[in-house]
């Protein structure tokens, strides 16, 4: 008789290597997210103080770069096309690692974040389309509310002091990685109007050389950085968005470990480049992209114009319903059950948190309304408003369960045997139980000694008291 299959757990315990990688990656992203938040606030202040507004516009639109190479760009343009290529390079490495060593390696495990991310992009696009069509607005911004900003989401978690269990954090990170993949495809397919095939061919040749050098084991930043810059410049001049070059190079790195390796080349390079991406590239992009004029009338327009209302509803309603619905449907069809410590309310809260769309949403907003400066600013204001509402809702929902999360995180990190490895990963190791037994035996012996000393002191005190009574008057 065949034994019944144990239902697969959704949001189950991560392996120790996955947990370690996740902790390192999210630590950097959290710091970067806080810097991103600071940069966004600085941009809004800079752009909205009358005495400083003109200087913000002057700096943002200041052009520099070699015109002969078609690279005489504004500061804001350099931030969007140049610095964000670093962000997408890291996204490419993350995606490659997830495909070869992470949740996306196993088709069954991959189904949950992939379907959730896909639904989390389709539903916001539908919400925007319906809202904009009903109000007679433009459909050009349908892709704006489809993106999730993992750094901003983690910054919110850091600010409100919530410690999500590692399984939910891993889901959020994997969701963001898949989300970035779809965003890359959207940018490449829908925002490429004209192609320069000579430049595109040159970029493809450059990528082939990049791949060949990696295959041959050639090392040295002085080889890859100049080559990467050439590939980026050719991709920019081809008409394809230049950030695609970063993704392509990231995907080419080897992310599986060979025997004797502590880290794969992809993991090593990601460890070096991620702080540059999270700490410099993305905050600078935010500084020169989030500086929109905020007035009472502008905020009112966000909720009255169909395009901007579509963006807000897409982020707040579409993202939440799409991700939550996709997760629930996938769990139903794959017969996966939630981890015992989690509830569907936790998944809903994380889905709400994923409604924070900032970096990529701002980028897509600039591309979608490139020829309409006024609408670009209004859509940016809508992205900021929608992200703020999503962050506020997520804060309330997560705070309700914060005590439970703290307990789960404490249990995940408990290390009674002081081995440096959390106990939950050693429960099947006899040596772990022997170490714990030795620790408790040592503690028991110490407590017995203390008890014996206290008892001896008490008996001595009693005996002394009896002697004093015998020496008294008859």
Swiss-Prot record:
Catalytic activity: Na(+)(in) + 2 H(+)(out) = Na(+)(out) + 2 H(+)(in)
This protein's name: Na(+)/H(+) antiporter NhaA 3
Native organism taxonomy: Bacteria, Bacillati, Actinomycetota, Actinomycetes, Kitasatosporales
Keyword Cell membrane: yes
Membrane topology: Multi-pass membrane protein
GO annotation (BP), single: regulation of pH
Membrane-crossing residue ranges in chain numbering: 31-51, 73-93, 110-130, 141-161, 171-191, 194-214, 220-240, 280-300, 309-329, 347-367, 378-398
Organism: Streptomyces coelicolor (strain ATCC BAA-471 / A3(2) / M145)
UniProt keywords, alphabetically: Antiport, Cell membrane, Ion transport, Membrane, Sodium, Sodium transport, Transmembrane, Transmembrane helix, Transport
Protein task: Na(+)/H(+) antiporter that extrudes sodium in exchange for external protons.
Gene Ontology molecular functions: sodium:proton antiporter activity
GO cellular component terms, semicolon-separated: plasma membrane
